[in-house]
């Protein structure tokens, strides 16, 4: 539902640090932004280190006049991925641009990240194929750590980096539950959840996605973690058609994270998660083993779960368990359910 506008940040916005005698202090609002970023970096940094987390959201429009989401990524270097939320039409465009310039000017100092490692994007509401469009061809990937795993991210070529930070608790949950399990990852994207399942001891895994690009990315992630051993299958297919074609296949742990909307030309029909989730859940739940667990997540903010769709299943809302400290300000960034067969007792 978003469109990326990508452009080079004007070098003039990042001036060399002046001497104490010549220093021009930023406007009051920008100073407030600096203070908030430094405070968040101190508090969230301690939290992240305790949890073995190297990539996290440090700021999410905490100050309404600076409507940015700022994510820190740490690998062999440190990077910042900065997204501006598109201002509503009621906001004066000139003033919004001034605030953006103020924010861009103070980010290197406040984050302690080099200017050339700050990547800036603008998010706009967008439906359809535009949200999957490729925006650059740099092909530059960086390895970051998450728990015991390593994952590749790309800051320039796509709308997102290849790692949904808000899903971190879900990936950790999958890793803890995966030992000895047959794991199925539907709409698998870059395979980050599959990496966690593999490192957690999954017996086998199957990751299904329509995109060859993302499956190649997933393959590289598996190789990076020593998991390219034949037990982890990558399938390029329309997930919905693929699920319906399965006969007799059973999985002990399934992660289902469909898009909000898709009209990809590779899909037989357009997909709308609100309209189609009931049929999708019925089909996917049929692949569960007797004691299997289905984790269903989506990021449609107005989503309403049809709890009557699976009468033989127990459906538990576990959203609160899957929102980490760095996303508490945006607690509806996704919703998540745990689905298992009802006990006959």
Could you tell me what each predicted segment is?
Residues 1, 239-242, 246-316:
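S-adenosylmethionine
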Residues 1-84:
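Non-catalytic accessory regions of SAM-dependent methyltransferases
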Residues 1-15, 293-345:
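C-terminal catalytic and target-recognition region of SAM-dependent MTase-like enzymes
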Residues 64, 69-71, 96-164, 172:
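Non-catalytic substrate-recognition/targeting regions of SAM-dependent transferases
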Residues 180-189:
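Conserved class I S-adenosyl-L-methionine
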Residues 190-202:
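Conserved SAM-binding loop of SAM-dependent methyltransferases across substrates and taxa
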Residues 204-209:
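Conserved SAM-binding motif I beta-strand of class I
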Residues 210-253:
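S-adenosyl-L-methionine
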């Amino acid at each position: 539902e978003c469109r990326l506008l990508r452009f080079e940040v004007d070098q003039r916005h990042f001036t060399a640090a002046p001497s104490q005698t010549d220093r021009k202090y930023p406007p009051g609002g920008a100073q407030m932004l600096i203070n908030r970023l430094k405070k968040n970096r101190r508090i969230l940094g301690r939290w992240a280190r305790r949890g073995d987390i190297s990539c996290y959201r440090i700021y999410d429009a905490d100050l309404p006049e600076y409507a940015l989401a700022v994510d820190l990524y740490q690998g062999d270097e440190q990077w910042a991925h900065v997204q501006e939320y598109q201002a509503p039409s009621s906001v004066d465009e000139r003033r919004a641009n001034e605030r953006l310039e103020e924010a861009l000017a103070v980010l290197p100092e406040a984050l302690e990240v080099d200017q050339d490692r700050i990547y800036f994007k603008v998010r706009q509401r967008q439906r359809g194929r535009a949200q999957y469009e490729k925006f650059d061809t740099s092909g530059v990937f960086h390895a970051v750590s998450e728990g015991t795993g390593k994952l590749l991210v790309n800051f320039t070529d796509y709308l997102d980096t290849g790692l949904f930070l808000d899903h971190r608790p879900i990936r950790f949950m999958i890793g803890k539950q995966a030992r000895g399990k047959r794991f199925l990852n539907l709409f698998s994207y870059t395979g980050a959840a599959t990496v966690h399942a593999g490192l957690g001891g999954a017996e086998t895994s199957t990751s299904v996605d329509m995109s060859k690009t993302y499956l190649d990315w997933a393959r590289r992630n598996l190789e990076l973690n020593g998991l390219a051993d034949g037990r982890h299958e990558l399938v390029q297919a329309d997930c919905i058609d693929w699920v319906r074609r399965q006969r007799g296949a059973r999985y002990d742990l399934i992660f289902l994270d469909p898009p909000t909307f898709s009209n990809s030309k590779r899909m037989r029909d357009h997909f709308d998660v609100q309209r189609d989730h009931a049929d999708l859940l019925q089909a996917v739940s049929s692949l569960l083993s007797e004691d299997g667990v289905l984790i269903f997540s989506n990021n449609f903010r107005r989503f309403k779960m049809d709890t009557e769709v699976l009468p033989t299943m127990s459906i538990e809302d576990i959203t609160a368990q899957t929102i980490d400290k760095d996303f508490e300000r945006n607690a509806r960034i996704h919703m998540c359910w745990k689905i298992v067969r009802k006990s006959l007792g």
